[in-house]
């Protein structure tokens, strides 16, 4: 099965962005006392994912701590998704900060993969942002080649776009703002470290066996991988070989909802208007 040509929009450090904190401010999002995301400013001070909260604060005393809030991340990402859907429907939200779509129709309509990627980057960059760092945001201050680059630094949402064969390769392409030509995903993936699979136990085992890159893993016979590492290993092996069989599951945009009520004669009393509004609210809820 041929991997689906896929576009990915990636907004770096999204949990930090969703909290309304800019990239230069040293900040970290914490869950279960460990850093799950951090800003570029924090990385510059030695903070990284997986560190315990106390160790992160030891490396960067000025670190702003943000409590993990998946709901906030999802709500803040909606303007980005709406911007993507303004160009094409059937967008999959892989997770807040990362969405994907199959490019076959959109690329044909907008003049090819490269044109689509550039347009998407510019469109997302102009997405409106209602995000404001509020007291209840959870932030605690210390006092408390053949590939085309498509990068956009404008607007409120820093984002990068990548296109490749399959969702896995497209996500890695987005991290480099690249359009990988059709059929070249295996070569593109080969130099990446085995950690790119985001399967820590499998990656640790492979590294102990001397297999440190996706290319080295992809070179192993598929039957041997299945026998040694089981179905999970076989699935990871397909990804490393650029044979990502996962289809993009685009969400169906919700229908436009509206209700109306004609008052004849017009309401002259507040209680009459309030009763009509209550009736409309009930009808809207039923939809």
PLM regions and their residue ranges:
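Residues that scaffold, gate, or flank divalent-cation-dependent active/transport sites
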Residues: 1-100, 105-107, 114-122, 163
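Amphipathic, charged-and-aliphatic alpha-helical interface segments
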Residues: 45, 184-219
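DNA-contacting surface of Y-family translesion DNA polymerases
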Residues: 8, 62-63, 203-287
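Short, conserved phosphate-binding/catalytic loop or strand-edge motifs used
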Residues: 96-101, 167-170, 201, 220, ...
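Short acidic, glycine/serine/threonine-rich loops at helix termini
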Residues: 20, 40-41, 113-114, 171-177, ...
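Short, low-complexity intrinsically disordered segments enriched in A/P/G/S/L with frequent Arg
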Residues: 128, 133, 145, 150-151, ...
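Structured, non-catalytic alpha/beta "coupling" segments that mediate domain-domain communication
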Residues: 82, 115, 119-125, 156-180, ...
């Amino acid at each position: 099965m041929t991997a689906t040509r896929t576009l990915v929009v990636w907004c770096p450090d999204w949990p930090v962005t969703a909290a309304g904190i800019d990239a230069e401010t040293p900040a970290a999002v914490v869950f279960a006392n460990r850093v799950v995301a951090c800003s570029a400013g924090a990385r510059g001070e030695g903070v990284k994912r997986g560190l315990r909260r106390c160790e992160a604060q030891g490396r960067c005393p000025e670190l702003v701590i943000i409590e993990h809030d998946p709901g906030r991340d999802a709500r803040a990402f909606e303007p980005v998704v709406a911007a993507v859907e303004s160009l094409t429907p059937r967008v999959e939200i892989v997770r807040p900060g990362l969405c994907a779509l199959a490019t076959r129709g959109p690329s044909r309509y907008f003049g090819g993969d490269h044109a689509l990627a550039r347009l998407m980057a510019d469109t997302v960059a102009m997405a409106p942002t209602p995000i404001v760092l509020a007291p209840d945001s959870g932030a605690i201050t210390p006092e408390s080649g053949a590939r085309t680059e498509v990068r956009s630094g404008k607007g409120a949402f820093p984002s990068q776009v990548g296109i490749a064969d399959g969702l896995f390769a497209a996500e890695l392409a987005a991290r480099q703002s690249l359009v990988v030509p059709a059929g070249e995903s295996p070569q593109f993936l080969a130099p990446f470290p085995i950690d790119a699979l985001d399967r820590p136990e499998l990656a640790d085992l492979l590294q102990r066996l001397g297999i440190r890159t996706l290319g080295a893993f992809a070179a192993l016979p598929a039957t041997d991988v299945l026998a040694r590492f089981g179905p999970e290993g076989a699935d990871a092996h397909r990804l490393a070989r650029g044979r990502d069989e996962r289809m993009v599951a685009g969400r169906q945009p919700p229908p436009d909802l509206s209700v109306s009520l004609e008052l004849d004669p017009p309401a002259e009393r507040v209680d009459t208007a309030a009763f009509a509004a209550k009736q409309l609210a009930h009808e809207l809820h039923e939809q």
